[in-house]
């Protein structure tokens, strides 16, 4: 049986005018700032007007460690939202925006897939409403103002060897990881080493996604540490006087984007920090607004539960004062096989034994999710190559962990295929079994926070960090930053820092290569192993297959 591509399905969607989608949430036409007919920004006035409403229930969708192609977490998020609406619940979804770089590299789009998509899919995976361009521009403005400050006399006495603020671009470009700037003569400034990160790794992105309003945004931007003086005292963004202009550039980007699913259910798509190099959750302002206008809000956190869900619980929920009522762990038969040692080329063939071996990875994620005090259900995201024997093997394993696994066919059937999952989620939420608590208290020393995550979530034996890193953490504690949560930057493919170490490894070590203080965002980034904050393109990038056809339509984009 042949299936339409995601882009063919999205183009055939029967979209409603965005004003009709907003009306489902109590929004009047004046509450929306339309970008065409099918997407809009939500006004700050509307957001302010619903603050007195009672909060709905929050459901987190996370996953096992992914295969390189991803496991359909966004697809499941969309499918579950549609499924909840199908069974009579007032539900909406909150997901992240797509980064251009990975879309032209190897990752799937950020709009779901099959019959569980958010539309307009093409625009969402490209420029959308321009939020990422605004973030890149605000970040770049600060970069320019730092070098300009140094050029015109360096009143703040910045040590040009200790400029912490790098540049960003929303593209996978390994050639820019490490560069020398200001070459070409005296008129171009003082030459120094710097580099580029991808926009989704920018602290500006993290700040936008954690800020409560424009006032909070401007304060957080001012708190960014951009450099250090020779006496090692920090230079802040506010010392460069950049936070006001940066806020102006981000004014519209702070407003959540409203779009719709294929089944005309509302969706907020806002913000997009990566989960392997940042905190991996959509914006606080979108999630908290959704909770005021819907009874059920389904959101996702990037990559596996060891990264996205851990940061959702320890960073986003802690900072935003929210708590999930249930967690859905997405698993696929093919990922079980890969974690069980099967090569990517052989994933289509039945291999029940490999599925059983790979289930240890799923079991670890279930244990970790439950350790936060939140009830869980496993969603088996169905693929046409899955066999009954393989599916039953997953169900039996999950049952042994005291959790139910539901086969969900939302990719193929939309809400009809996800209704059983939706029913189970409602059962968990209404059962009132959630007693959420983060993994560590604010007052725990920073290095102990790192060890807590490494040992309790990754099941490592030890954290390897040299004296320089440990001393840096102590200095930050003495400077008043010891209460901040830690944001682990590591590979998404394994519980360890080795992407090839599949399954549920124990007894491994977590090497810390670098620590970065994101004072504006409000967390410490802990860079582990070989993770890069600027990805590269694969040998055959997806961009090679993307073009416009004779009708002016995009081809090759999913």
From Swiss-Prot:
Q: Which UniProt keywords apply?
A: ATP-binding, Ligase, Nucleotide-binding, One-carbon metabolism
Q: Does the keyword Cytoplasm apply?
A: no
Q: Which InterPro entries match?
A: Formate_THF_ligase (IPR000559), Formate_THF_ligase_CS (IPR020628), P-loop_NTPase (IPR027417)
Which EC numbers does the record give?
A: 6.3.4.3
Q: Does the entry feature the keyword Lyase, yes or no?
A: no
Q: In which pathway does it act?
A: One-carbon metabolism; tetrahydrofolate interconversion
Q: Pfam families from the xrefs? A: FTHFS (PF01268)
What domain of life?
A: Bacteria
HAMAP family of this UniProt entry? FTHFS
Q: Which family does it belong to?
A: Belongs to the formate--tetrahydrofolate ligase family.
State what protein this is by name: Formate--tetrahydrofolate ligase
Please tell me the species this chain comes from: Ruegeria sp. (strain TM1040)
């Amino acid at each position: 049986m042949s299936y339409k591509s995601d882009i063919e399905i999205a183009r055939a969607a029967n979209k409603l005018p965005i004003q009709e989608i907003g009306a489902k949430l109590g929004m009047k036409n004046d509450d929306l700032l339309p970008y065409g007919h099918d997407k809009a920004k939500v006004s700050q006035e509307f957001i302010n007007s619903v603050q007195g409403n009672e909060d709905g229930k929050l459901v987190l969708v996370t996953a096992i460690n992914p295969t390189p192609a991803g496991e359909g977490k966004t697809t499941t998020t969309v499918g579950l939202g549609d499924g909840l609406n199908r069974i009579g619940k007032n539900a909406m979804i909150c997901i992240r925006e797509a980064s251009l770089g990975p879309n032209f590299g190897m990752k799937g789009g950020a709009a779901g897939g099959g019959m569980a998509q958010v539309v307009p899919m093409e625009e969402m995976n490209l420029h959308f409403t321009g939020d990422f361009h605004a973030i890149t521009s605000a970040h770049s403005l600060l970069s320019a103002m730092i070098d300009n400050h140094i050029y015109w006399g360096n009143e703040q006495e910045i040590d040009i060897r200790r400029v912490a603020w790098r540049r960003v671009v929303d593209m996978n470009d390994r050639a820019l990881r490490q560069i020398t700037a200001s070459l070409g003569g005296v008129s171009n400034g003082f030459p120094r080493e710097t580099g580029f990160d991808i926009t989704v790794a920018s602290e500006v992105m993290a700040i936008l996604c954690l800020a409560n309003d424009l006032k909070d945004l401007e304060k957080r931007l001012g708190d960014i540490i951009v450099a250090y003086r020779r006496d090692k005292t920090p230079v802040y963004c506010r010392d460069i006087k950049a936070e006001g202009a940066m806020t102006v550039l981000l004014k519209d980007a702070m407003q959540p984007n409203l779009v719709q699913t294929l089944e005309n259910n509302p969706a907020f798509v806002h913000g997009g920090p990566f989960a392997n190099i940042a905190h991996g959750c959509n914006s606080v302002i979108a999630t908290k607004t959704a909770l005021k206008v819907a009874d059920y809000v389904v959101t996702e956190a990037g990559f596996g539960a060891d990264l996205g869900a851990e940061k959702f619980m320890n960073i986003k929920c802690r900072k935003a004062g929210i708590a999930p009522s249930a967690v859905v762990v997405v698993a696929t038969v093919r990922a079980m096989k890969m974690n069980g040692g099967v090569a990517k080329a052989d994933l289509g063939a039945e291999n029940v034994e490999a599925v059983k071996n790979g289930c240890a990875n799923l079991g670890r994620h279930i244990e970790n999710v439950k350790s936060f005090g939140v009830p869980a259900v496993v969603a088996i995201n169905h693929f046409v190559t899955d066999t009954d024997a393989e599916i039953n093997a997953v169900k039996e394993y999950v049952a042994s962990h005291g959790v139910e696994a539901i086969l969900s066919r939302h990719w193929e059937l939309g809400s009809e295929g996800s209704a059983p999952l939706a029913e189970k989620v409602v059962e968990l939420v209404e059962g009132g079994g959630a007693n959420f608590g983060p993994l560590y208290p604010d007052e725990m020393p920073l290095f102990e926070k790192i060890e807590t995550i490494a040992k309790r979530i990754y099941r490592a034996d030890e954290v390897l960090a040299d004296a320089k890193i440990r001393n840096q953490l102590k200095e930050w504690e003495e400077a008043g930053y010891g209460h901040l949560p830690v944001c682990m930057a590591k590979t998404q493919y394994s519980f360890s820092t080795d992407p090839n170490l599949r399954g549920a490894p124990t007894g491994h070590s977590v090497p810390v290569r670098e620590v970065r203080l994101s004072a504006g965002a409000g967390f410490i980034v802990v860079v582990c192993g070989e993770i890069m904050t600027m990805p590269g393109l694969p040998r055959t990038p997806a961009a090679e297959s993307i073009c416009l056809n004779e009708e002016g339509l995009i081809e090759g984009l999913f």
